[in-house]
């Protein structure tokens, strides 16, 4: 994958297909699992390559992109996305922000609407750091401890658990193989590299803490598509419904019985592809 130096950081990216540009902002919070055993994003094979130029990239402190211990906000992460578009000579693009990529996409669309043809928000919400969910409190506590005790002290407390991958109940052979690779890689990685990944993950958590776009959703004027699984255990389906209610002109595509990682479901892929093709037909 090529790299681009933008907004003070080196980003790894990939571009597939030709046509109307679409930028995919991935989810997750970076860290060791994304770098030692990168995932393949389903969107890469979802869209017609003769009509859409799909651009995928690793956010800072994730995947093969640069790790930094600097503090930043979602404005910074949206600036990274814009910087990549500038690097590629792209003025406007369809933006797809999945899961933790959703708030970044919202920041980009609200701050620079002239750069966004249309916006898709799969399995995400306006405030992912909400204390309504246990993960929100856990991540906030981790950030606060990192600030008060220091990154190295927090790493010393977490090191053993960081070397054990989060269990997966996936039945997909490719994901099972990835988990096995990750398990071995986490045992082999040096403490110095694991510390770097740990700090990067915490910095990503921090960027979301005060980011709540609920009150500004009505400002969005571009076409908006929301895709959410009704059985999502990570980002509740109700959060997707809340986006739809607040963005009056948005489309809502519920995917029955689907969990998180919605774009890997056939129904979601069909909904996304259909929406993108309708958007393209209007701008062509």
Language model: regions and residue ranges:
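Conserved HGGG/HGGXW glycine-rich cap/lid loop of the alpha/beta-hydrolase fold
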Residues: 5-67
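Active-site loop/oxyanion-hole signature of alpha/beta-hydrolase fold enzymes
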Residues: 40, 44, 55-94
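Flexible "cap/lid" loop of the alpha/beta hydrolase fold
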Residues: 110, 117-150, 200
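Conserved alpha/beta-hydrolase catalytic His-Asp/Glu region
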Residues: 131, 152-207, 216
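Short beta-strand/loop motif that positions the catalytic acidic residue
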Residues: 220, 226-228, 232
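Conserved alpha/beta-hydrolase "acid-adjacent" motif
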Residues: 233-239
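Catalytic active-site module of serine/aspartate enzymes centered on a nucleophile-bearing elbow/loop
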Residues: 250-284
């Amino acid at each position: 994958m090529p790299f681009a130096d933008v907004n003070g950081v080196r980003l790894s990216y990939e571009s597939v297909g030709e046509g109307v540009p679409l930028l995919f902002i991935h989810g997750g919070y970076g860290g060791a699992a994304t770098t030692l055993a990168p995932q393949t994003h389903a969107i890469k094979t979802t869209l017609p390559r003769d009509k859409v130029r799909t651009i995928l990239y690793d956010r800072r402190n994730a995947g093969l992109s640069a790790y930094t211990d600097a503090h930043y906000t979602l404005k910074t992460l949206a600036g990274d996305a814009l910087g990549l578009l500038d690097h590629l000579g792209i003025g406007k693009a369809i933006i797809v922000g999945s899961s933790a990529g959703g708030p970044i996409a919202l920041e980009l669309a609200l701050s620079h609407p002239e750069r966004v043809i249309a916006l898709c928000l799969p399995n995400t919400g306006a405030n992912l750091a909400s204390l309504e969910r246990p993960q929100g409190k856990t991540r906030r506590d981790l950030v606060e401890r990192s600030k008060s005790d220091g990154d190295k002290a927090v790493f010393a407390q977490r090191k053993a658990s960081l070397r054990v991958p989060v269990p997966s109940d996936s039945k997909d052979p490719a994901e099972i193989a990835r988990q096995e690779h990750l398990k071995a890689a986490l045992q082999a990685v040096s403490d110095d590299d694991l510390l770097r990944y740990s700090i990067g993950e915490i910095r990503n958590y921090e960027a979301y803490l005060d980011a709540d776009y609920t009150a500004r959703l009505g400002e969005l004027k571009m076409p908006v598509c929301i895709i959410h699984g009704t059985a999502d255990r990570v980002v509740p389906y109700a959060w997707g419904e809340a986006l739809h209610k607040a963005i009056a002109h948005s489309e809502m595509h519920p995917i029955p019985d689907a969990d998180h990682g919605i774009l890997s479901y056939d129904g979601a892929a069909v909904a996304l592809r259909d929406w993108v093709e309708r958007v393209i037909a209007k701008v062509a």
